[in-house]
Amino acid sequence: MFSRKDIIVLGMMIFALFLGAGNIIFPPMEGFSSGQHWTSASLGFVLTGVLMPFITLVVVAILGRGEELTKDLPKWAGTGFLVILYLTIGSTFAMPRITNVAYEMAWLPLGLTENNANVRFVFSLIFNLIAMGFMISPNTIISSVGKFMTPALLVLLIAVAITVFISPLSEIQAPSNAYENSHSLLIGLTSGYQTMDVLAAIAFGGIVARALSAKNVTKTKDIVKYTISAGFVSVILLAGLYFSLFYLGATSAAVAEGATNGGQIFSRYVNVLFGSAGTWIMAGIIVLASLTTLVGVTSASADYFSKFSVRFSYPFWAALFTAMTITVSQYGLTDLLRITIPALLLIYPVAIVLVLLQFLRKKLPSIKFTYNSTLLVTVCFSLCDSLNNVKMLPESINSLLKHFPLSSEGMAWLVPTLVMLVASIFIGKALHKTHS
């Protein structure tokens, strides 16, 4: 039986898994830029940064695992997409980046050691071995993350949020030109889209499904019920946090001068509010947020790759990905970001469309035709966005791409994909009549 306490613990686990260090340091800059429009901007951010991943999580939990989203694609295409997804959000790019964030934003400000390659390696080794200790047995993840790490993280974040609303550092300033000239809700939507949490939801859905299965929750109706209930807990927590961080950014004029990212704004704000203790509070928040995401993503990646061969089990892949993360994290953040972004621009739209098609699947007259044709269009346009990001897109194609709606927001794929989806449904009906 899944009790109310179990729902709360699962909800807190989902919250902690999504709440990576990047999710904490990104909203303050958006809040600072949106200024007096911070409420509508944060609403847009929450819609795409919280609601969309939540919907994806429910869909994947019902299916049982993320790979079920690709079952109607050719096997090579589905496997290729998932391998790229898990490597991108996992030990090849995102997890080394999280390790670097923990090192540079949590450890170094404490001033306990010098900043050099040896210290970075030792920190990466210890940090990832601690994470591996939590993930080596997947059945302990809900317990370790939901019962221990999340409450500690919440205490620190709530302390910051309450203090920010009680004692804001500055009056809310006028919005930047981008927010002044455009509808702040739409900019917030785009900003939330850039969190890439839909990709993480595909990975985390399997963790939620296993957590429910461990409590003998296997019926679809019950999976939906408890996933929505637990997910609602995480939605409330994440939305509350994001609104707080947007407000922090909107009232940060006194400390934001010269800041190039939200992490700097957050760090300065916390240090002013809490004095010398602020450095330790900041370190605690970043380390716990980084650790929970590291545990969740690496565990999900190991679980997926363990399906390929019985010779290489979950512990083997967990150890391998931990070693990869430690190795890759020795490179700088700039290099990691430069390589990661093009991969994300390619696969994120595909993930969104896969979730959309899953909702429509039972109503499609020709499932495989709609999947293949719609995703082909999505991949073509998202590939253009990816190549354009690294300045490898031919100018002739780039000039044509600019004529598509939302191309300036990096979403040129959206309208052509929807057009192809509708067209494929009509074509599928015609094909169905022809063969009947």
Curated annotation (Swiss-Prot):
It is a multi-pass membrane protein. InterPro entries: Brnchd-chn_aa_trnsp_Livcs (IPR004685). Its main location: membrane. It is found in: Cell inner membrane. GO terms for biological process: isoleucine transport; L-leucine transport; valine transport. It holds the Pfam family Branch_AA_trans. The chain crosses the membrane at residues 7-27, 43-63, 76-96, 122-142, 148-168, 185-205, 228-248, 277-297, 314-334, 339-359, 411-431. GO terms for molecular function: L-isoleucine transmembrane transporter activity; L-leucine transmembrane transporter activity; L-valine transmembrane transporter activity. One of its GO terms (cellular component) is plasma membrane. The keyword Transport applies. Keywords: Amino-acid transport, Cell inner membrane, Cell membrane, Membrane, Transmembrane, Transmembrane helix, Transport. Belongs to the branched chain amino acid transporter family. Branched chain amino acid transport system, which transports leucine, valine and isoleucine. NCBIfam families: livcs. This is Branched-chain amino acid permease BrnQ. It comes from Haemophilus influenzae (strain ATCC 51907 / DSM 11121 / KW20 / Rd). The gene is brnQ.
